[in-house]
């Protein structure tokens, strides 16, 4: 603590707050920020062909597949673009496109049906992530809202990790649906489900699974307490509607699509086009909340980089007549190639965490663990619990290790947070990784299974703490950290003087709370 305070010209002692969960979360945020900071954007150039058939135009993306003169060429950025613009232009010139059009031949035309099932029900983490996106509120605020809804008997117990129902609840689920007929926004939907009896057999679906429930089943509406709904805030009322609609969706059929993939060839160069046509709206008809600005769509956001797995997206360009013409396309048919153009893009860095995605990252932290046995130990539970994750994130913000943009809910480290990270990285590196939590959880499991005694487990734990504390005390970090602190500080507009005031306040708060560990 003194090393950090000296660097900030404060000179006061200040305890450093650490914990097996909170320090791991700090590490995740700092690592992500440094990945973004060090990322070097790479430009690339895709070639898009403009095709037509009986008056209907559509785009196709060129790829260097087998048979192309550019197959596995060093000139490529992946298989669907070039590193240099002049190489992309050379390809266009080689296609010999002359007005008004030249011919291309369809060498593959695939049509297949796809289904999109209703999502699983909300657990707390998934609800916090959704509310962060929809309402730009923190996980802590979401927890307070859903706790209020629970206390008013509007929803079931909120601090749950499960996204499914229990068999016992499924048998009585018609009561919840029946109660929702008193909720004006979904009255007709609830009545329709009851009349069709589509709730019957729900226990045989993926939405009911006793094995996936540890303490409590998913968050669902009780179908009661509607008088209390008038006394909650607008945001709370909207959160309730989101929970209700997610619940009712599982009693609706899947959305259905016709996926058409076309491959057209011109002078041995292949272009790919895809069309995704909704044939049955299914649950999407009721999924969109009444306050939403626009209807839910199933279209996934395109990445800046583009994907080699997806051909040119034509989903939003088709009317009924166009759809019928596209359906007629078959292997061996000739279509028009009017032109080709270069679309410039650039690689993009990883995204910063927002408050919702951070909660999900904590829940899914096991994915970051390479060791299979350790990964299995926290699979399905992650780091922290549904009841503590929001609190841990809030604490990191309160002690000024992390910064939360209230408008966007984006999370970034502070200068102090990065300095703490560097100190922990050099002294007790294990605290920054979920492997530590997983190994401790594994030890607890071994105690429960009788493979080791409680005394043996505590001995190993005490040994870990003692050894690392002695290691920190035995080394002089005063001069070691300055280059790291300088490097981090260069990325912050805040002067040391401002940082000094902030950190001094943080240090005072820490001493009062005695640094309770997460």
Locations of regions flagged by a protein language model:
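Non-catalytic DNA-recognition/assembly elements of restriction-modification systems
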Residues: 430-500
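Phosphate-backbone binding and catalysis cores of DNA-processing enzymes
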Residues: 1-101, 107, 214-277, 485, ...
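Short secondary-structure boundary/capping segments
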Residues: 11, 164-176, 236, 274-282, ...
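A short, polar/proline- and glycine-enriched secondary-structure boundary/capping micro-motif
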Residues: 70-72, 282-286, 422-425
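Hydrophobic, well-ordered secondary-structure scaffolds
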Residues: 23, 292-296
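GHKL-family ATPase ATP-binding module
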Residues: 158, 200, 255-259, 263-267, ...
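Glycine-centered small-residue hotspots that permit tight backbone geometry or close packing
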Residues: 19, 43, 274-286, 290, ...
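Structured DNA-binding interfaces in DNA transaction proteins
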Residues: 82-241, 247-251, 255-259, 297-444, ...
